Amino acid sequence: MTSSNLIKQLQERGLVAQVTDEDALAERLAQGPISLYCGFDPTADSLHLGHLVPLLCLKRFQLAGHRPVALVGGATGMIGDPSFKASERKLNTEDTVNEWVEKIRHQVSPFLDFDCGENSAIAANNYDWFGGMNVLTFLRDIGKHFSVNQMINKEAVKQRLNRDDSGISFTEFSYNLLQAYDFACLNKNHGVALQIGGSDQWGNITSGIDLTRRLHQQQVYGLTVPLITKADGTKFGKTEGGAVWLDPKKTSPYKFYQFWINTADADVYRFLKFFTFMSLEEINALEEEDKNSGKAPRAQYVLAENVTGMVHGPEGLAAAKRITDSLFSGDLHDMTEADFAQLAQDGMPTVELNRDADLQQALVNAELVPSRGQARTMIGSNAVAINGEKQADPEYVFTDADRLFGRYTLLRRGKKHYCLISWL
């Protein structure tokens, strides 16, 4: 992306929900590089897919020559943003928040270049300016610039105030002031002139613009990226098991890869615009190719490879593809011990068995069949595979060769029903 028409390029990809004074911002970007920031509050020990679009937006600006600031909210994370939340957030301990700050800082770092000259990225933590601030300073220097009338009319707060079952605490009500001061502080210390964030952050961003103008007489700007939705109306970034996390210990590279592989045809080309750095020409050409091929579309695999490689690196992508190919072909010889551990982590049905269990008992314990009699029938009808190889002997007893890495055996009934045995 080039700097001169960056806003237009983002709009063409569907990446702009709202922008303050679009013409003035476009003119400012055309004049030369600016500094911009996006904040990430440590409300969990990992970022999830919902954070990926604004994070990649920071990267898009850096690739166009601008300087990104990744702000981790060590202070705001102890308060909790009430924006469009139905109820009060649970307050986490300072130790927990500090631990999560470090984890999120490490997650953000690979997406940005912190050593590329004048537009090298900056990592910041708002606890650095809020940690030592006393309440009188907060009220006198920040609070006096805010009208409560305007604050309660912001849509994000109004929704909470209108709920009969829950109001809003002063703690969460004050969050807006904290985020606003972040913008003013980063403007003073790093010349930050633009804040980006999710569309739910619009009220906080405009407050920061107003406060920066009052405190520093600077014109600054805000831009929000859209809330990602799926064509069928269901939530994006959720599976039956919950959120899709960027931390491989919470969502393995294989499960992450499979999430993208399962993208609906109605969504995949739009998601390529949101989550990859492919040009629009490349995406349009891929869509045309898929339409004319008469085969299953290639786009899901392109999307899965791009995003998994970006988040989990070459090794994570290789493992995800290796597991996928092995389960599809039934040939498990290329799988590593860590690959089997990923399957267990991802929620593949797993059962622990003593080493004297036979195949019939294993099928029953694995809940692949209801009884030993049914197990005999399934085995005899060639419907059971051990580590990808069919086994037709109803009296079969496992051998050491079946215990891959001395501990794992993958049972399959039919084509889709799996269970991973972990041998005791």
UniProtKB/Swiss-Prot annotation:
PROSITE patterns: AA_TRNA_LIGASE_I, S4. GO terms for cellular component: cytosol. A motif ('HIGH' region) lies at residues 42-51. It catalyses: tRNA(Tyr) + L-tyrosine + ATP = L-tyrosyl-tRNA(Tyr) + AMP + diphosphate + H(+). It is found in: Cytoplasm. Residues 357-414 form the S4 RNA-binding domain. Keywords: Aminoacyl-tRNA synthetase, ATP-binding, Cytoplasm, Ligase, Nucleotide-binding, Protein biosynthesis, RNA-binding. Its EC number is 6.1.1.1. GO terms for molecular function: ATP binding; RNA binding; tyrosine-tRNA ligase activity. InterPro entries: aa-tRNA-synth_I_CS, aa-tRNA-synth_Ic, Rossmann-like_a/b/a_fold, S4_RNA-bd, S4_RNA-bd_sf, SYY-like_C, Tyr-tRNA-ligase, Tyr-tRNA-ligase_bac-type. L-tyrosine binds at Y37, Y175, Q179. It comes from the Bacteria. Belongs to the class-I aminoacyl-tRNA synthetase family. TyrS type 1 subfamily. HAMAP family: Tyr_tRNA_synth_type1 (MF_02006). Homodimer. Catalyzes the attachment of tyrosine to tRNA(Tyr) in a two-step reaction: tyrosine is first activated by ATP to form Tyr-AMP and then transferred to the acceptor end of tRNA(Tyr). PANTHER family: TYROSINE--TRNA LIGASE, MITOCHONDRIAL (PTHR11766:SF0), TYROSYL-TRNA SYNTHETASE (PTHR11766). This is Tyrosine--tRNA ligase. It comes from Yersinia pestis.
